[in-house]
Amino acid sequence: MLLLAGCAGAPMPDPLGPQRRQQIREAILDAHWAPIVADYPDALRPTVHSMKPVSDHDQPAAVLACLRSTGIAASPTDNGFRYNSSLGQSQLEFEAVRYVCSASSPSESEVESYLSGSSRAALFDYQATIVRPCLLAAGAMSPAPPDGGPAYYLSAALAAWSPFMQILASKPRVGTVAYLEKRCPPLPAWLELAGPGVHEVGTH
């Protein structure tokens, strides 16, 4: 009998640490809430119970699914989302739900903008030595990472590389990317910014 296993590696050290993780989490929450409170100064900030970064490719779909799960009839646009107000939600109610949904699933690029050089190096190492070999073992295409040493960790060349970039460019069949992401998670577990039982109550 042939058993197929995923490409899970050994537990990795935590490049962030709890204090820096909380700082990044709070910065992302503040960034997502700022445009809302600017328009609605008296708005009460909702609670965001979890924060799990997703790839840039998956982020719009993750937010859209979250919006729809709350009963909001949302649809994507070129620069975000719109909603059908026929169900009775006000614009503020929609913005509050969108805040929770978008802050719960920040994009990889957004989170990476808060990482130090050593944390970016750890993310690069995970994608280059775990994700890419896993994709190749699954029979998928994956480009070699830029080879420039530590200087690349903060460069545009590194930001432009992803082990999934060839897969996405090939316009794969429906379900292919989801299967490969489940088998070869594009982001490491240590990048999750809040685990079960961690709650953030907004007050501003």
Where are these regions (language model features)?
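C-terminal motif of bacterial Sec signal peptides marking the signal peptidase cleavage site
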Residues: L3-G6
